[in-house]
């Protein structure tokens, strides 16, 4: 802003070496003030006219005016740098770089020195940390800018916790870590999305197969995804060959998810009617080719992970 604090005693030291002994100096903003010895300035003085201002020194000897002389106060402008800033770097994009800039006016004649030792107006970096750049004018005036580069990153999926097998409420919790800030989305096998949300927990998730997407919103570093399943059991099926609900099979198991699970079907008296695995199409409602009647049937599901579920369903004809 062209304003600076001057110690007028520094001028006195230089001038008194050229004057006879016993001379004292006082400073004034105007010649008239110096002439009338009014409004003397303090020795620690802030100039009131930006960049260039003339004040007056009155030299006295035994209370007699020895002379009045001009003193020129000059404030040389500092380099024009933008404010300190914080930038983000996506660690997953290494070794790509981001640009750090002193953000000075075009066509300037500054000299630059970065904390990295580089001497250009901008530099490319791919390491987080604190960087400084000092710009110096041809007059030797310097100013320093600090740029902090902080990390962001895509998420690492540590675990997907699924509380399933419940008729009323299956709960999915996504455990992820990383330097970013994340939103969570799950998409079912039909491509329908629950929508992105801040919470990593999803309630009332229907049985089936899903993909979880985790998006970094701190610096848009990217999206990671992973498949998972929610186990569930149909309450009924209608094996009438109309292409809908013709087979009874456990939801959320397949050749990819818990393929070594064992599924057993019993009649109401506990007789084993059939046994199959997730890789089969399921039970078609027949035993040895004979259609079973409309009734309730019981199942035991022994999942590959060791969990066991028992319940019943209805065969409708």
Identify the meaning behind each predicted range.
Residues 38-54, 120-138, 199-209, 281-284:
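Solvent-exposed segments in extracellular or luminal domains encompassing
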Residues 56-60, 132-136, 211-215, 298-302:
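Extracellular recognition modules
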Residues 113-119, 189-198, 274-279:
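Short beta-strand segments within Ig-like beta-sandwich modules, predominantly Fibronectin type-III
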Residues 15-29, 104-113, 178-185, 190, ...:
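Solvent-exposed loop segments of extracellular immunoglobulin-like
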Residues 74-81, 150-158, 165, 207, ...:
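Extracellular interdomain linker/stem segments of modular secreted and single-pass surface proteins
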